[in-house]
UniProtKB/Swiss-Prot annotation:
ATP binds at residues 166-173. This is Mitochondrial import inner membrane translocase subunit TIM44. Keywords: ATP-binding, Membrane, Mitochondrion, Mitochondrion inner membrane, Nucleotide-binding, Phosphoprotein, Protein transport, Transit peptide, Translocation, Transport. The gene is Timm44. Probable component of the PAM complex at least composed of a mitochondrial HSP70 protein, GRPEL1 or GRPEL2, TIMM44, TIMM16/PAM16 and TIMM14/DNAJC19. The complex interacts with the TIMM23 component of the TIM23 complex. Interacts with SLC25A4/ANT1 and SLC25A5/ANT2; leading to inhibit the presequence translocase TIMM23, thereby promoting stabilization of PINK1. It is a peripheral membrane protein. Pfam families: Tim44. The modification N6-succinyllysine is found at residues 177, 217. One of its GO terms (molecular function) is ATP binding. It comes from Mus musculus (Mouse). It is found in: Mitochondrion inner membrane. The lineage of its organism: Eukaryota, Metazoa, Chordata, Craniata, Vertebrata. The modification Phosphoserine is found at residue 180.
């Protein structure tokens, strides 16, 4: 009963428990670390039970253990430092180290003494040389040598002044000026004919009209007059010229077949055709005018009657550097006033119509030309109104048209189009200045996308 009461936490027989409390508690196997307290405040009996863990250390005991461990470590560290100092002291006091120090000090002292001796010897030698030079300068031979050196210096100075004055006089002579102008002219021709062709394409700083052409300066210094006897033709209006040219182009089967074959020939990427193209171009340049009289020779002869200074190579260079860039840039950028000045009326209407429609819808032209190459004179044709030269060339163009929001409406800024152009340039008989006499009579183009 007592055990049951104890397990329930309350004892129902206080007297009995008090009488045999010690015996009762000792007769039970209690858990390790448990303690029981029986008290009687007043007449009530209270049994208190508490437990403590015997295996868990207290905070103070753990702290003491840590302090002991740190002290043990410090002791080991002190012993290690002491041993290191002892070893260093033994090394410091060793005979080998003492001997090495003595040798180093002796070498250092010898070096200092040697440097001082060399310095002293140099001072003595300098003084001796100075005294010897003073003695030589005071002697007759020394004075003569000194006077000779001074005389040579004066002579050299006078010679330099004389050469300078002679150079100035030579530069003012007419012969020297003529030679200088000739050298400058040759250099300018080389820059224009060689360097200008091999360099990359550059857009003109400002698109110019024919009247603003670079040859306008030439126009001021010369007066051009028409040779009516040599010409033997009557001047006509643009509409009649264009109509005659259009009839010839549309109805002549040989002309159309020729250009169809030439376009395929020029656009071919075949290695053999490209090699043969270079060979045929060279042979044509060398032997083109040695045989029978051709229509091209008649056209060139007619041009020479009007303009005796005309040259085929110079004309092609003019097309590549001025005529083609101005017209082509005006076409892709929508510069209508430039086109109107360079083109005949019918050609201008044909080119201006799509540009005017695009501008009316608010579109913007952002196309650009990357390169112009292979400018060639294909053929010539004598028309009633005057000579017409057919010029072919290739151009690499990026075609881009954007709307008012800046979005790409047509074209692709990342795609390069290789264009093959055929232009018919007619010499304006009303314009006597050869640098502004050529106008665009007709234009034809075909395009292919360039992969590389």
């Amino acid at each position: 009963m007592a055990a049951a009461a104890l397990r329930g936490g309350w004892c129902r027989c206080p007297r009995r428990c008090l009488g045999s409390g010690i015996q009762f508690l000792s007769s039970h196997n209690l858990p390790h670390g448990s303690s029981y307290q029986i008290s009687r405040p007043g007449r009530e009996l209270t049994l208190t039970k508490s437990y403590s863990s015997g295996s868990r250390k207290g905070f103070l005991s753990g702290l003491l253990d840590n302090i002991k461990q740190e002290l043990a470590k410090n002791k080991e560290m002190k012993e290690s430092i002491k041993k290191f100092r002892d070893e260093a002291k033994k090394l410091e006091e060793s005979d080998a180290l003492q001997e090495a120090r003595r040798k180093y000090k002796s070498i250092e002292s010898e070096t200092v003494r040697t440097s001082e001796a060399i310095k002293k010897k140099l001072g003595e030698l300098t003084g001796t040389v100075k005294e010897s030079l003073d003695e030589v300068s005071k002697s007759d031979l020394g004075r003569k040598i000194k006077e000779g050196v001074e005389e040579a210096a004066r002579t050299a100075k006078q010679s330099a002044e004389s050469v300078s004055k002679s150079g100035e006089k030579l530069g003012k002579t007419a012969a020297f000026k003529a030679i200088s102008q000739g050298v400058e002219s040759v250099k300018k021709e080389l820059d224009e004919s060689v360097l200008g062709q091999t360099g990359p394409y550059r857009r003109p700083e400002r698109l110019r009209k024919r009247t603003e052409f670079a040859g306008a300066k030439f126009k001021e210094s010369k007066v051009f007059e028409a040779n009516e006897e040599a010409l033997g033709v009557v001047l006509h209006k643009d509409s009649k010229w264009y109509q005659q040219w259009k009839d010839f182009k549309d109805n002549n089967v040989v002309f159309n077949r020729f250009f169809e074959m030439k376009m395929k020939y020029d656009e071919s990427d075949n290695v053999l055709i490209r090699a043969s193209r270079a060979l045929t171009d060279k042979v044509t340049d060398l032997l083109g005018g040695l045989f029978s009289k051709t229509e091209m020779s008649e056209v060139l002869t007619e041009i020479l009657r009007v303009d005796p200074t005309f040259d085929k190579d110079h004309f092609l260079h003019q097309c590549e550097t001025d005529i083609i860039p101005n017209i082509l840039e005006a076409m892709i950028s929508g510069e209508l006033d430039i086109l109107k000045d360079w083109c005949y009326e019918a050609t201008y209407s044909q080119l201006a119509h799509p540009i005017q429609q695009a501008k009316a819808l608010g579109f913007q032209f952002h196309s650009r030309i990357l390169d112009i190459s292979n400018v060639d004179l294909a053929m010539g044709k004598m028309m009633e109104q005057g000579p017409v030269l057919i010029v072919t060339f290739q151009a690499q163009v990026v075609m881009v048209i954007k709307n008012s929001k800046g979005e790409v409406y047509d074209g692709d800024p990342d795609k390069v189009q290789r264009m093959l152009y055929v232009w018919a340039l007619c010499r304006d008989q009303e314009e006597l200045n050869p640098y502004a006499a050529w106008r665009l009579l007709d234009i034809s183009a075909s395009s292919t996308e360039q992969i590389l």
